[in-house]
C-alpha cells in the first residue's frame, strides 16, 4: 500500500449518500469537444440526421481511425461551434433505441484475443476514446503502445461516488474489461485501502492500494509512484466505469452508456448517487433537485470540473459527478473584519481552523481578487508528488517550458494542480496555465 500524507480532503457539505437511485430520464445527450485535447473533428453528420447508438458522429483529422460515436439514438439537434469554429458540442435528441452491433466474444475467450482484435473493436465502437495518455491527456494514437495501463478504481475527489458501490453491481463486466485491457499492456488496478475488487488476481493485472487525502485517488498520483512518464515514455489511463463498458462491449457486442454519478453539493436537496447515461443533459438531470436560488451546475468535481451551461450543459466524457454550488455573486460588507467561522482556509487565518470536522457550504466565490503569487508553503502542503510545486508553478506562469519539463510538468494534468489553485493566495487557475504549456511542449518540444 502507498500512503499519501500531503494533500487535502475539502470539507464541503452535501456529500452524497452512497446508494444508487434511478435519475429522471433525460431527453438529450451530447459529446463535448472540450473533453478531447487537440482533437480536430471531421464531421460525419449534420443537424437533422437520425443516428443510431454507436454511429460515428465525427473522426479526428490527425487520427482518422479514431471514431467518436453517438451516446444515444435519435436526431442530431445541434452542432455548437465557438470562435474559429472550434467544436463545442454535438447534441442528440433521444428518440428510439436503434443501435449498432459490434464484435462479441465468449467471456472465457477474452484472454486469448490479440491486441489487434481489441484495438479494432474499441476503435469501431468509439470506446477507444475512453483511454487517455499521460503525458498530455489525449486520446492515444492507435499505432502507439503504452508502458502500462492504469485503471482508477478509487475516487478521492470532493463529493465523489464510492467506486466499490458501482463495481459491486457489475463485477463480471469489470473483470472482463480488465482481461481485455490486459491484452494491450500490463494493467495497474489502483484501489482504496482495504478494498477487494473483481479481477485483482488476473494475469497481467497488478492491484495497488492507495490511502490518504486527495489527490490519493488521481491517476497522476498513481502513475507518479508506479510507472512515471516522461518525454520518451507514456502510459494510458481510464476510469472504472469505462472498464465496465469495455467488458460489456466485448461480451455483448453493444455499447453500455449507463453512468452512475454523484449528484451532490451544498445546494442539493437530496445528495445521492444516480443512474443516468453518458453525455446526459445536466439541466434536465438537476431539475427539481436543488434549493431555490442562483446555483451553478458543474460537470465533474468542484476542484477540476467545468461549468455546465449552454452548449456545455452535458455530462463530460470523463466525469462521474454533477456538483452543485451556490453562485458567489454577493459581496460581503467588511468581510476582512469577520472571524471567518463559515469559511475554510488551509492557512491559519480564520477561526474555523479551530473547529475540527466542520463542513462548509462552499460557493463559487474566490474570496478575493487576482494578485501576485505568494510562496508561503501552501502548495507544498497539498502536493504529494516528488516535485517542487512553487518553482514549477512559477515557470508555468511565465511560460518557460524547458524548465517546466525538468520540474515534472509532463507528469501532470489539470486535475493534478486543482488543489494548488484552491490554496493559491494569488487566485491563479493553474489548470489552464498547465494546458497552455503542455500544448506548446507538444508542438515545439
UniProtKB/Swiss-Prot annotation:
Reaction catalyzed: a ubiquinone + n Na(+)(in) + NADH + H(+) = a ubiquinol + n Na(+)(out) + NAD(+)
Pfam families in the cross-refs: NQRA_2nd, NQRA_N, NQRA_SLBB
Enzymatic class: translocase
GO molecular function: oxidoreductase activity, acting on NAD(P)H, quinone or similar compound as acceptor
Keywords: Ion transport, NAD, Sodium, Sodium transport, Translocase, Transport, Ubiquinone
InterPro entries: NqrA, NQRA_2nd, NqrA_C_domain, NQRA_N
Top-rank taxon, per record: Bacteria
EC identifiers of the protein: 7.2.1.1
Biological process annotations from GO: sodium ion transport
Keyword check for NAD: yes
Annotated function: NQR complex catalyzes the reduction of ubiquinone-1 to ubiquinol by two successive reactions, coupled with the transport of Na(+) ions from the cytoplasm to the periplasm. NqrA to NqrE are probably involved in the second step, the conversion of ubisemiquinone to ubiquinol.
HAMAP family associated with the record: NqrA
Subunit (UniProt): Composed of six subunits; NqrA, NqrB, NqrC, NqrD, NqrE and NqrF.
Family (UniProt): Belongs to the NqrA family.
Protein name per Swiss-Prot or TrEMBL: Na(+)-translocating NADH-quinone reductase subunit A
Amino acid at each position: 500500500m502507498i500512503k499519501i500524507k500531503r494533500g487535502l480532503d475539502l470539507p464541503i457539505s452535501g456529500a452524497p449518500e452512497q446508494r444508487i437511485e434511478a435519475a429522471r430520464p433525460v431527453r438529450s445527450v451530447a459529446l463535448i469537444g472540450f473533453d478531447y485535447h487537440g482533437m480536430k473533428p471531421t464531421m460525419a453528420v449534420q443537424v437533422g440526421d437520425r443516428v443510431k447508438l454507436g454511429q460515428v458522429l465525427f473522426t479526428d483529422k490527425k487520427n482518422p481511425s479514431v471514431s467518436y460515436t453517438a451516446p444515444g439514438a435519435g436526431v442530431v439537434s445541434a452542432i455548437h461551434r465557438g470562435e474559429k469554429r472550434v467544436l463545442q458540442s454535438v447534441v442528440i435528441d433521444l428518440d428510439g433505441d436503434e443501435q449498432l452491433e459490434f464484435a462479441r466474444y465468449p467471456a472465457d475467450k477474452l484472454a486469448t484475443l490479440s491486441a489487434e482484435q481489441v484495438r479494432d473493436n474499441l476503435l469501431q465502437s468509439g470506446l477507444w476514446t475512453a483511454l487517455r495518455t499521460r503525458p498530455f491527456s489525449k486520446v492515444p494514437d492507435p499505432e502507439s503502445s503504452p508502458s502500462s495501463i492504469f485503471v482508477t478504481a478509487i475516487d478521492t475527489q470532493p463529493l465523489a461516488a464510492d467506486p466499490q458501490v458501482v463495481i459491486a453491481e457489475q463485477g463480471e463486466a469489470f473483470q472482463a474489461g480488465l482481461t481485455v485491457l490486459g491484452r494491450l499492456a500490463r494493467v495497474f488496478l489502483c484501489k482504496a485501502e482495504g478494498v477487494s475488487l473483481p479481477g485483482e488476481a488476473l494475469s497481467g493485472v497488478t492491484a495497488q492500494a492507495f490511502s490518504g487525502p486527495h489527490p490519493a485517488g488521481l491517476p497522476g498520483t498513481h502513475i507518479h509512484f508506479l510507472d512515471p512518464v516522461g518525454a520518451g515514455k507514456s502510459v494510458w489511463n481510464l476510469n472504472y466505469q469505462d472498464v465496465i463498458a469495455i467488458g460489456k462491449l466485448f461480451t455483448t457486442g453493444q455499447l453500455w452508456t449507463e453512468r452512475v454519478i454523484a449528484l451532490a453539493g451544498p445546494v442539493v436537496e437530496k445528495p445521492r448517487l444516480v443512474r443516468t447515461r453518458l453525455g446526459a443533459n445536466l439541466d434536465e438531470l438537476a431539475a427539481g433537485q436543488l434549493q431555490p436560488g442562483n446555483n451553478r451546475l458543474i460537470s465533474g468535481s468542484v476542484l477540476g470540473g467545468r461549468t455546465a451551461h449552454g452548449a456545455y450543459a452535458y455530462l463530460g466524457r470523463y466525469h462521474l459527478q454533477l456538483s452543485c454550488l451556490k453562485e458567489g455573486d454577493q459581496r460581503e460588507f467588511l468581510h476582512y473584519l469577520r472571524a471567518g467561522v463559515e469559511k475554510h482556509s488551509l492557512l491559519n487565518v480564520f477561526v474555523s481552523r479551530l473547529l475540527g470536522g466542520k463542513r462548509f457550504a462552499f460557493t463559487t466565490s474566490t474570496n478575493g481578487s487576482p494578485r501576485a503569487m505568494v510562496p508561503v508553503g501552501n502548495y507544498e502542503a497539498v502536493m504529494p508528488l516528488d516535485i517542487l510545486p512553487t518553482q514549477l508553478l512559477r515557470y508555468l506562469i511565465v511560460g518557460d517550458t524547458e524548465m517546466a519539463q525538468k520540474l515534472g510538468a509532463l507528469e501532470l494534468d489539470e486535475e493534478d494542480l486543482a488543489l494548488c489553485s484552491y490554496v493559491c493566495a494569488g487566485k491563479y487557475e493553474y489548470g489552464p496555465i498547465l494546458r497552455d504549456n503542455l500544448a506548446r511542449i507538444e508542438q515545439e518540444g
